[in-house]
Amino acid sequence: MGRMRGEALAQEVLRLKRERNAVILAHSYQLPEVQEVADFVGDSLGLAREAQRTRAEVIVFCGVHFMAETAAILNPEKTVLLPDLEAGCSLADSIRPEDVLAWKAKHPDGIVVAYVNTKAEVKALADVCVTSANAVEVVSRLPQDRPIYFVPDMFLGAHVARATGRRLDLFPGECHVHAGIREEHLKALLEAHPGAEFLIHPECGCGSGCLYLKPDAKMLSTEGMVRYAKGAEAREFVVATEVGILHRLKKEAPEKAFFPVKPDAVCEYMKRITLEKVYLSLKEMRHVVRVPEEVAGRARRALEAMVAVG
């Protein structure tokens, strides 16, 4: 995409957005040029809240499929567009409704906590949904005397168990991008930047090992990373998450330096959303995301509980 072509395309996207009475929501892992045309860039919790409060008739969701589903469930009266229907999620794909039903059959009084990175059919079986930003707070409020099943990310679940002191049954799912970030990627970077603060996403597979290398690490959601970096006195940060966040970190804290633990930690699903696909989505109103009401109605309760916390 040439410079003029990119700028012209961005202008067309903004024109169509006004014409369609649309809002563009983008996750922090999106390509920089997609983030730049968005009305709001944030994490799953922020995006869900923004989708709930918008007055626009059309929501163009620049993220992955479960995020667009979430927007559609929370806004059944609005049109939700996903610029590329192939923008999936390996973590959301890892768990099936049958997995949850099998656990519930063994624990009839149990509570199912579903990470937002799940399909609508799994959310419909959950008691509450969480994001990485509010999982600890939500779980800490749950009754002490009932078993809890945390699905599907085992690393986030382990972090929540550590932080709350609660015993959780964990589904063995993982995000392939975050699971691939290892201690060996971190060691040399910390040695090269001894004064840097270390920001790590709770989905990372190296959680305990990385904390051993850097005990004062900050385990944060993507939104938490942005907020922390802006307010911290440190000038350098080592960052363990998908590299799309770097664009936002540099934009919101331009006087600071950010170093990715794994420069090739790229979610190919997030990167399927391009500026051209956003343009075509708005132009042709294509790839409408719909969730059947019998599923959406049950999932909505769990999502509304999530949006209310944190």
From Swiss-Prot:
It catalyses: iminosuccinate + dihydroxyacetone phosphate = quinolinate + phosphate + 2 H2O + H(+). Its EC number is 2.5.1.72. It is an enzyme of class 2 (transferase). [4Fe-4S] cluster binds at residues 89, 175, 267. Iminosuccinate binds at residues 27, 44, 115-117, 132, 201-203, 222. NCBIfam families: nadA (TIGR00550), PRK09375.1-2 (NF006878), PRK09375.1-4 (NF006879). Belongs to the quinolinate synthase family. Type 2 subfamily. This is Quinolinate synthase.
